[in-house]
């Protein structure tokens, strides 16, 4: 038996147009989105199946990828494919409204939910890290997090700077699949940004895709550019090659005062995602094979230094927040007792949106035609005519965001509006206004689909941060409601042992059957977010539940 391979020198792109390569659009859609996750315009390291986030993969190995593709092409519309940590393990007879694919990635019994145990399983070919949208086949490149990052920066501007970020600058690090959204989000919010990244290839990627505007040659040059652009009120993003664990302490030593500090390095995965200070990337990858425990220790030591610098900025009164990569936890484990003195971005800025079921609604055009996305942009404006903030986002997205792979759009909307938009998109497919079906999905980072005490569910007012029944219920309800594919993952965003989360995708193929499924899924999915926050006692969520007619027996009293 040949050894399964995680490397293949190949380029993959999803088919375009309206010609099927599978038996229906319900199986063509997951096939194209799986391939799109591995498009070289989309994935961080597609030849090793890595989509984003350290080692977040789309399939366990290339043999599994081949068999998934083969199976999806043969799958009937009354069958369901089961995928276990990136490996296709079964096809079962179900029914037309059941999901065509059910995915479980990286899930471990809690006592064994550690990176050490996971890495052992991964090395033996028994597991795969799915991150959030890597293993659930709905990653759309950095755009997928741009609006969430933009909303965070805008809200921080409202809270700290009277809603005006002109002449202000953000200090951050990480230009990978997620962190790469930061420079563009800051620019769209009106601020300059200094973005530290330890790999030149990632800086080059963001420069090519226009997510970052310029690269400075060194720290002095970067600070000179920041000073010039902030004085002129220009929102320009600057990349700097270097190590955040070295540069942030130097900025503190120099007395430099950013206007906002955060971080989006892959600190959740010390073995694969965070370069120790003083090391080259080549040393880091080589030693990860020969001395993984030593690498983890060195990376976490550097994270501790990084967080201490962030704490120093906070002590100066500078708004400082964690952007969900678990760096505070890593620093705390290295002895930084007050690592959690600065907040995470969700309790600080995003939770009121979650209380209304508002989160990262996204869709992709299976046709590959950008015009299909532009037509849906116009439909969103037509159906939501009075939301100037949303209209501004769509205008900026069209102007500044380069599509990666299949054209796609991210748009934060909540309960009520998601179903309205989904049904409208389905009608556009039916009428021929769109040239092929649309898939609608979301990040697992949503209001009802994740339990993550150091990120999305940090500081819940009832203390239910670590209760993970909610994403399980979300996945079960989306399955019962007829989503086209449903996923249930562990460890995304913050690493092993720190999160559980679920995802869903539904196809708009223009049929009546699709319309019925869309109405159920795109109501019930955000409805679980309102339910979860109402159950925790948030008045905004309770009011939303009543306004939207949710039947929450312990809260709304509806029978």
Curated annotation (Swiss-Prot):
Q: What does this protein do?
A: Catalyzes the conversion of urocanate to 4-imidazolone-5-propionate.
Task: Kindly state which keywords UniProt assigns to this record, in alphabetical order.
Answer: Cytoplasm, Histidine metabolism, Lyase, NAD
Tell me the classification of the organism that encodes this protein.
Answer: Bacteria, Pseudomonadati, Pseudomonadota, Gammaproteobacteria, Pseudomonadales
User: What is the name of this protein?
Assistant: Urocanate hydratase
Whichever gene encodes this chain, its name is: hutU
Question: Which pathway?
Answer: Amino-acid degradation; L-histidine degradation into L-glutamate; N-formimidoyl-L-glutamate from L-histidine: step 2/3
Which InterPro entries does the record associate with it? Urocanase, Urocanase-like, Urocanase_C, Urocanase_central_sf, Urocanase_CS, Urocanase_N, Urocanase_Rossmann-like, Urocanase_sf
* Principal location: cytoplasm
Q: Name one GO biological process term.
A: L-histidine catabolic process to glutamate and formamide
The subcellular localization recorded is:
Cytoplasm
Q: Write down the chemical reaction(s) this protein catalyses.
A: 4-imidazolone-5-propanoate = trans-urocanate + H2O
Q: Where are the transmembrane segments?
A: none
Mind telling me which PANTHER family this protein's record contains? UROCANATE HYDRATASE
Family per similarity comment: Belongs to the urocanase family.
Q: Which organism is it from?
A: Pseudomonas paraeruginosa (strain DSM 24068 / PA7)
**Positions annotated as active site in the UniProt record:** 411
Annotated positions binding NAD(+): 53-54, 131, 177-179, 197, 202, 243-244, 264-268, 274-275, 323, 493
In terms of NCBIfam families, this protein maps to: hutU, PRK05414.1
Q: Which cofactor does it need?
A: NAD(+)
């Amino acid at each position: 038996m040949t050894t399964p391979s995680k490397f293949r020198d190949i380029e993959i792109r999803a088919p375009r147009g309206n010609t099927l390569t599978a038996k229906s659009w319900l199986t063509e859609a997951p096939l194209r989105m799986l391939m799109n996750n591995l498009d070289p315009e989309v994935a961080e390291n597609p030849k090793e199946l890595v989509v984003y986030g350290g080692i977040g993969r789309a399939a366990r190995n290339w043999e599994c990828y081949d068999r998934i593709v083969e199976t999806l092409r043969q799958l009937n519309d009354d069958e369901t494919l089961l995928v276990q940590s990136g490996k296709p393990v079964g096809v079962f007879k179900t029914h037309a409204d059941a999901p065509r694919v059910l995915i479980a990635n990286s899930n471990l019994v809690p006592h064994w939910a550690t990176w050490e145990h996971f890495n052992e399983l991964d090395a033996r070919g028994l597991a795969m890290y799915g991150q959030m949208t890597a293993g659930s086949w709905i990653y759309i490149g950095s755009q997928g997090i741009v609006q969430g990052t933009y909303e965070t920066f805008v809200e921080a501007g409202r809270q700290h700077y009277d809603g005006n970020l002109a002449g202000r600058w953000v200090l951050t690090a990480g230009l990978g699949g997620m962190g790469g959204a930061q420079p563009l989000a800051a620019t769209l919010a009106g601020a300059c940004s200094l973005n530290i990244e330890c790999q030149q290839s990632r800086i080059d990627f963001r420069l090519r895709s226009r997510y970052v505007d310029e690269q400075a040659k060194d720290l002095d040059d970067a600070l000179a550019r920041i000073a010039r652009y902030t004085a002129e009120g220009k929102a320009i993003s600057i990349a700097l090659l270097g190590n955040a664990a070295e540069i942030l302490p130097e900025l503190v030593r120099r007395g430099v005062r950013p206007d906002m500090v955060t971080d989006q390095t892959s600190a959740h995965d010390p073995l694969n995602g965070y370069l120790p200070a003083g090391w080259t990337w080549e040393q880091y990858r080589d030693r990860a094979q020969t001395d993984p425990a030593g690498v983890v220790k060195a990376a976490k030591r550097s994270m501790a230094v990084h967080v201490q610098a962030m704490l120093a900025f906070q002590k100066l009164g500078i708004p400082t927040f964690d952007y969900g990569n678990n760096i505070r936890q890593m620093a705390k484990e290295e002895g930084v007792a007050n690592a959690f003195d600065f907040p995470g971005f969700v309790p600080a800025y995003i939770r009121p949106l979650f209380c209304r079921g508002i989160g990262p609604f996204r869709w992709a055009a299976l046709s590959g035609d950008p015009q299909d996305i532009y037509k849906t942009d116009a439909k969103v404006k037509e159906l939501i005519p009075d939301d100037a903030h949303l209209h501004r986002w769509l205008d900026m997205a069209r102007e500044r965001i380069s599509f990666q792979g299949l054209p796609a759009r991210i748009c934060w909307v909540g309960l009520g509006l998601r179903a309205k938009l989904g049904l409208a998109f389905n009608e556009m497919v039916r009428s021929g206004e769109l040239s092929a079906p649309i898939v609608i999905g979301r990040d697992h980072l949503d209001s009802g689909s994740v339990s993550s005490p150091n990120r999305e569910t940090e500081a819940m007012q009832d203390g239910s941060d670590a209760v993970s029944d909610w994403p399980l219920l979300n996945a079960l309800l989306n399955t019962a409601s007829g989503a086209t594919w449903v996923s249930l993952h562990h460890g995304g965003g913050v690493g092993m042992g720190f999160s559980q989360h679920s995802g869903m995708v539904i196809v708009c193929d223009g049929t009546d059957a699709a319309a019925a499924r869309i109405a159920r899924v795109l109501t019930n999915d955000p409805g679980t977010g309102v339910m979860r926050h109402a159950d925790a006692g948030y008045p905004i969520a309770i009011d939303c539940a009543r306004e939207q007619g949710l039947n929450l027996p312990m809260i709304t009293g509806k029978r």
